[in-house]
């Protein structure tokens, strides 16, 4: 909202400088984006009177003008504007003047003819194209009235005025009119605004005999008023009105339309004027209703719009003539030939106006105000003021009476609260009288009954709803800078992470330490992806009632598909060596509740090379054992109650049937690890890709609650190596479990150090070599004790697996 400082002074006895006033406004809660004076930087620009205008002897578009600029002799100025003519009062930049963008104008020659300055358009002295009257956009500006030559143009064009640009939040729509801003400034400066009463001089013709109106549904337009003017003359507005408009960022059009915009700026109430003679029938009829499917409307910007049954329209009983609260129709536009005018002032349904403006891409000053709300008490006041001014400027007659099919009466809003609560909330020691004074400065009526305050809110402040709003108003005027600063009080407590939080943090640290990079995927996906790689029993994915897109309609039940999408994205950009993980929640349905359970999972993905090629080493591709080793490291970090075991599985159609293992902690299934199915890899353009997915919620339940530290052993370990030739179907886990079963109480670890299949080994068999480590924590082991335990292991392996000791 651009606020004219001079316009404010029409209502307030202001003495505070504009910059200081802007600072005060900002400190009370309305941000001031800028304070500007359009004349700043300009020099030696005056009003000139064109005495004569002749064609340039050496040009088909230039004119040689004699211009009275208040000097002893007229100045000869060459001008290229197509609309320059003798008798005009124009803007003249004298020699050595400064115009917009710090351009200096000098005496010069144009095609051999001396030119003593420049006749200017508004844009050349700093006006935006959007506020220049259309008839002057491509030419010079012509003053609509005579002004003494040589007079500085700044005052005449309103350029000496200071414009305070308010950056309003949606709740302060009351400041979208100069009256609302005047009330705000009056409260800040402890002043009383003085507004003139509106008086309308009416003719003997009754409006109701010329015009009728109806509103199909009161919800569409709770308030709807119409007035009528007859025998008006459409002409340019006086200069004072044009300056008020362009200083507010609005283009002047003609005296009737300019009045509606002026009243919108004054009261914050949008108005619209219809050419009454364009409406069908002798007795004019206005109807407010929802549009019908198939109806069209060409708006004032000459764009045609296909209307929907959610658009509120104004009709003449037959066809739409305006989009209510947004923009008028081209078919009822005020033109130079308009003689009779209907003025509309209304309150339209805010949500409907907002949706219509968005749907048709027609954001306007009017729609912005209707969306945020308008002052119920000022609707007819603005209408009456507009009618009176139109009659004055257009020399027309206002018919008697207002047609009002709906009229929402202002409802007094009363808020009661304990004055002590204000001090509790603000941390102040403010007296009750101070609170009352602050509220009365805002124009609120206050009654005090034993420090219980009853505040009556004026209709212009419809943003005040509850006690907290009133307390905020007190704080604003009291001054946020005056509120005392206090340190928080209370007992100091030591923060700590829960067991679960520690485990989750340890998970991230472990995986990042192993070289994986964290990824974050959308929790919403497609139905197909939601059901893949699921650790839980097959179930239906949870679907959103109102999804944003079909690709984000279901809640995920796994993390792997998100990692695959991330991998495919990277591969498409030539990044093929990938190591990613994601820790997050999946959503699993539960039979006893409508909403799904949120379960903590962690998943990882590796593809490409784990070791890039260098001058020392060849490239090493990722394989099953690479990712299984990472899972082993991760599982070891949890201090689990039972051993971790891997069992081959082909139960997952998305996984390679021969390179996938189910992961167990004791007897509890907690996840999978393995290679994704080649078909899925091909579909996503990935090389061999390995993944793991773990149910962290289950794993955290299987942690030991305490960790017992052991001292370093005092006695030496003893190791024995054994190489076994076994059938290929025998797994490492089978052999390790068998060794531990018969290893005796001194066996502390078993590690595989070699696997071989090839020459010197029968087909269908392989060689696996292990190191067995023995330790007695209380004494040194003897050879006899170790050999006896080792021989039991060998005998058991031979008997169980038909193993051959090599």
Curated annotation (Swiss-Prot):
Residues 410-485 form the B5 domain. Residues 713-806 form the FDX-ACB domain. It comes from the Bacteria. Its main location: cytoplasm. SMART domains: B3_4, B5, FDX-ACB. Binds 2 magnesium ions per tetramer. Keywords: Aminoacyl-tRNA synthetase, ATP-binding, Cytoplasm, Ligase, Magnesium, Metal-binding, Nucleotide-binding, Protein biosynthesis, RNA-binding, tRNA-binding. Its cofactor is Mg(2+). Belongs to the phenylalanyl-tRNA synthetase beta subunit family. Type 1 subfamily. Tetramer of two alpha and two beta subunits. This is Phenylalanine--tRNA ligase beta subunit. It comes from Latilactobacillus sakei subsp. sakei (strain 23K) (Lactobacillus sakei subsp. sakei). The gene is pheT.
């Amino acid at each position: 909202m651009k606020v004219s400082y001079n316009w404010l002074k029409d209502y307030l006895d202001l003495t505070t400088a504009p910059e200081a006033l802007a600072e005060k406004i900002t400190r009370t809660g309305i941000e001031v984006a800028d304070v500007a004076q359009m004349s700043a930087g300009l020099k030696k620009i005056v009003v000139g009177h064109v005495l004569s205008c002749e064609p340039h002897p050496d040009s088909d578009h230039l004119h040689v003008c004699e211009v009275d600029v208040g000097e002893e002799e007229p100045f000869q100025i060459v001008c290229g504007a197509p609309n320059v003519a003798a008798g005009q009062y124009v803007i003249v930049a004298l020699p050595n003047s400064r115009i917009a963008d710090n351009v200096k104008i000098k005496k010069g020659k144009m095609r051999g003819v001396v030119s003593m300055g420049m006749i200017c358009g508004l844009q050349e002295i700093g006006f935006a194209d959007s506020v220049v009257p259309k008839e002057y956009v491509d030419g010079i500006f012509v003053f609509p009235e005579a002004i003494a030559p040589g007079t500085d143009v700044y005052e005449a064009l309103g350029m000496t005025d200071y414009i305070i640009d308010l950056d309003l939040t949606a709740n302060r729509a009351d400041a979208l009119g100069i009256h609302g801003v005047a009330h705000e400034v009056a409260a800040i400066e402890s002043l009383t605004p003085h507004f003139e009463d509106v008086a309308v001089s009416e003719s003997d013709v009754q409006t109701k005999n010329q015009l009728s109106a109806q509103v199909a549904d009161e919800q569409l337009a709770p308030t709807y008023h119409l007035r009528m003017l007859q025998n008006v003359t459409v002409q340019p507005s006086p200069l004072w009105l044009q300056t008020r408009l362009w200083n507010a960022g609005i283009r002047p059009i003609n005296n009737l339309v300019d009045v509606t915009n002026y009243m919108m700026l004054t009261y914050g109430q949008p108005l619209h004027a219809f050419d009454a003679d364009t409406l069908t029938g002798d007795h004019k009829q206005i109807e407010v209703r929802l549009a019908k499917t198939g109806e069209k409307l060409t708006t004032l910007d000459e764009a045609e719009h296909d209307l929907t049954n959610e658009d509120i329209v104004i009709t003449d009983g037959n066809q739409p003539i305006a989009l209510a609260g947004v923009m008028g129709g081209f078919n009822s536009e005020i033109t130079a030939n308009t003689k009779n005018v209907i003025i509309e002032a209304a309150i339209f349904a805010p949500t409907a106006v907002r949706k219509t403006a968005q749907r048709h891409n027609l954001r306007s000053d009017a729609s912005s105000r209707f969306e945020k709300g308008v002052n119920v008490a000022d609707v007819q006041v603005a209408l009456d003021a507009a009618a009176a001014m139109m009659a004055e400027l257009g020399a027309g007659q206002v018919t008697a009476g207002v047609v009002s099919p709906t009229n929402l009466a202002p409802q007094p809003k009363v808020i009661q609260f304990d004055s002590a609560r204000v001090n509790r909330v603000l941390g102040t020691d403010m007296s009750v009288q101070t609170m009352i004074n602050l509220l009365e400065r805002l124009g609120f009526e206050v009654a005090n009954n034993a420090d219980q305050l009853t505040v009556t809110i004026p209709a212009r402040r419809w943003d005040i709803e509850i006690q907290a709003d009133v307390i905020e108003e007190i704080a604003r005027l009291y001054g946020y800078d005056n509120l005392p600063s206090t340190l928080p009080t209370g007992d100091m407590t030591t923060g700590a992470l829960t067991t679960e939080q520690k485990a989750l943090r340890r998970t991230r640290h472990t995986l990042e330490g192993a070289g994986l990079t964290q990824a974050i995927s959308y929790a919403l996906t497609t139905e197909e992806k939601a059901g893949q790689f699921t650790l839980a029993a097959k179930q239906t994915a949870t679907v959103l009632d109102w999804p944003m897109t079909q690709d984000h309609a279901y809640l995920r039940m796994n993390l792997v598909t998100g990692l695959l999408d991330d991998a495919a994205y990277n591969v498409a950009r030539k990044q093929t060596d990938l190591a990613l993980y994601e820790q997050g929640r999946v959503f699993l349905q539960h039979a006893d509740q409508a909403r799904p359970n949120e379960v903590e999972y962690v998943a990882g993905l590796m593809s490409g090379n784990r070791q890039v090629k260098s001058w020392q080493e060849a490239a090493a591709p990722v394989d099953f054992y690479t990712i299984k080793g990472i899972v082993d490291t991760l599982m070891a970090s949890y201090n689990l109650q039972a051993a971790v075991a891997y069992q081959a599985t082909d139960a997952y159609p998305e996984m390679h049937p021969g390179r996938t293992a189910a992961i167990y902690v004791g007897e509890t299934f907690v996840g999978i690890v393995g290679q994704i199915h080649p078909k899925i890899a091909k579909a996503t353009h990935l090389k061999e890709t390995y993944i793991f997915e773990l149910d962290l919620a289950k794993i955290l339940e299987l942690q030991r609650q305490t960790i017992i530290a052991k001292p370093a052993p005092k006695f030496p370990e003893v190791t024995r190596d054994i190489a076994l030739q076994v059938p290929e179907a025998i797994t490492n886990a089978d052999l390790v479990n068998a060794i531990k079963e018969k290893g005796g109480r001194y066996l502390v670890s078993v590690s595989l150090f070699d696997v071989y299949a090839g020459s010197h080994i029968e087909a269908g068999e392989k060689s696996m070599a292990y190191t067995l480590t023995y330790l007695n924590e209380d004494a040194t082991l003897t050879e006899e004790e170790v050999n006896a335990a080792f021989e039991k292991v060998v005998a058991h392996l031979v008997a169980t697996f038909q193993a051959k000791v090599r």
